[in-house]
């Protein structure tokens, strides 16, 4: 697989790239590195609904127990729920088996520290070095020193109670909820109903194969139609591991992470609760977000793509709200990672407080036209370093000047290069983006 850790843990095609053997070795190395401070460590493990989850979980657990660590198994649970339980169960570390919004054949393994944060690059590198190394620095336990598996039967209930504690009653709101047949398929509709929301559920019947299949935050088309058909106040869509949220307004229009951050930031600022009067976003956020927040006296910090980098900037600046256009949004006062259900509840709370339709709240931001084209490539690094691609990007930058921007970046989790162009005229932007894409494709031949 080359370098194991990407921007969101280890990802690959399950049983081909991410094999049980690799999961076993990651379990051993991860447990050893993350548990050095603990004499008999305990590690939380959870997963999404993919068919390969059971296989990889079994291998991972075997690796962890073989170095003398106990496993706290929480079963199917959203990624942010696993981060929350890692903290509150006072575990030494947490592990999520999920490939988030990726298709069913993929899976992933992602570690959390004892505080519920994603691991720093240096710690991931230490784990990776051990996975590749023939040296095994840990002692081999026998007898009573081998790790046990402890089932956490009420894991979903604990997470739902935490979520409910962040807002008041949401009675009177009608929502179409799309669980992407993923980790939030049960807890999503349940927590909404317990808060008084009228819920029309979509894609909440996982069968191991249908996760993210034409549903969820990356495929909101069915949700858009359902919101209009049911005359709902809004639609909410999570992805496979429910660490992101995309909303749909009452007219069936997409309300992405940029709009959600603007809505929540303005509401928090109005109540004097926006720490540092600041928000952290990535370079992919629309220029319209920058304009809307600047007009409200809110400072915007920008970082590279990846919610781990958003988190680092939040900790550095003292801001408490940050996220990505894709819907990874971090409310640091409540949780240590992007949390799709938490974000949904905060958004619904603003809706209830202000008594306005979500389309009116979203109108505070005017989105500038933006074109994003994903190009599948054999070698991301080679494509990104190609001089002809660089030359074309510089040409587009000069043409746009201050009227827009162009951004070319490689995906952290897939073999893709993303070309994003933003400006005033959509048709013109399509042509500019395509001109960059054409060079990337030409150089692939």
Curated annotation (Swiss-Prot):
Enzyme class: isomerase
Natural source organism: Desulfitobacterium hafniense (strain Y51)
Protein name (Swiss-Prot/TrEMBL): Phosphoglucosamine mutase
Keywords, ordered alphabetically: Isomerase, Magnesium, Metal-binding, Phosphoprotein
GO biological process: carbohydrate metabolic process; peptidoglycan biosynthetic process; UDP-N-acetylglucosamine biosynthetic process
Residues that, per the record, bind Mg(2+): 100, 239, 241, 243
Modification Phosphoserine, positions: 100
KW tRNA processing (keyword) present: no
Active-site residues annotated for this sequence: 100 (phosphoserine intermediate)
Pfam families, alphabetized: PGM_PMM_I, PGM_PMM_II, PGM_PMM_III, PGM_PMM_IV
Cofactors named for this entry: Mg(2+)
Native organism taxonomy: Bacteria, Bacillati, Bacillota, Clostridia, Eubacteriales
């Amino acid at each position: 697989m080359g370098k194991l850790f990407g921007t969101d843990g280890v990802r690959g095609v399950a049983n081909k790239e991410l094999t049980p053997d690799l999961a076993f070795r990651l379990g051993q190395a991860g447990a050893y590195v993350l548990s050095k401070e603990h004499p008999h460590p305990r590690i939380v493990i959870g997963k999404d609904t993919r068919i390969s989850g059971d296989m990889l979980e079994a291998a991972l657990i075997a690796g962890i127990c073989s170095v003398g660590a106990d496993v706290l198994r929480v079963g199917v649970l959203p990624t942010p729920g696993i981060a929350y339980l890692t903290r509150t169960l006072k575990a030494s570390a947490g592990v999520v088996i999920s490939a988030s919004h990726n298709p069913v054949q993929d899976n992933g393994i992602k570690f959390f520290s004892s505080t519920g944060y994603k691991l720093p690059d240096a710690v991931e590198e230490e784990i990776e070095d051990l996975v590749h190394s023939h040296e095994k620095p840990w002692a081999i336990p026998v007898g009573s020193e081998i790790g046990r598996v402890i089932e956490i039967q009420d894991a979903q209930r604990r997470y739902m109670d935490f979520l409910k504690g962040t807002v008041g009653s949401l009675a009177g709101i009608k929502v179409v909820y799309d669980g992407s047949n993923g980790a939030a398929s049960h807890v999503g509709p349940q927590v909404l109903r317990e808060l008084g929301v009228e819920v029309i559920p979509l894609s909440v019947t996982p069968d191991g194969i249908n996760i993210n299949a034409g549903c969820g935050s990356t495929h909101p088309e069915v949700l858009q139609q359902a919101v209009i058909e049911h005359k709902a106040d809004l639609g909410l869509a999570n992805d496979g591991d429910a660490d992101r949220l995309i909303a749909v307004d009452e007219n069936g229009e997409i309300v992405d992470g940029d709009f959600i951050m603007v809505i929540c930031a303005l509401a928090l600022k109005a109540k004097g609760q926006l720490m540092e009067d600041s928000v952290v976003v990535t370079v992919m956020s629309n220029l319209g977000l920058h304009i809307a927040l600047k007009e409200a006296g809110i400072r915007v910090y920008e970082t590279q793509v990846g919610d781990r980098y958003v988190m680092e900037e939040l900790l550095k600046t003292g801001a408490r709200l940050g996220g990505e256009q894709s819907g990874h949004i971090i409310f640091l006062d409540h949780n240590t990672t992007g949390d799709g259900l938490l974000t949904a509840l905060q958004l619904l709370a603003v809706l209830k407080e202000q008594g306005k339709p979500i389309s009116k709240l979203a109108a505070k931001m005017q989105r500038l036209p933006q074109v994003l084209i994903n190009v599948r490539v054999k070698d991301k690094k080679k494509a990104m370093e190609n001089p002809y691609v660089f030359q074309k990007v510089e040409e587009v930058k000069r043409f746009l000047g201050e009227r827009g921007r162009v951004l070319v970046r490689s995906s952290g989790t897939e073999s893709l290069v993303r070309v994003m162009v933003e400006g005033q005229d959509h048709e013109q932007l399509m042509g500019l983006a395509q001109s960059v894409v054409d060079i990337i494709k030409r150089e692939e031949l």
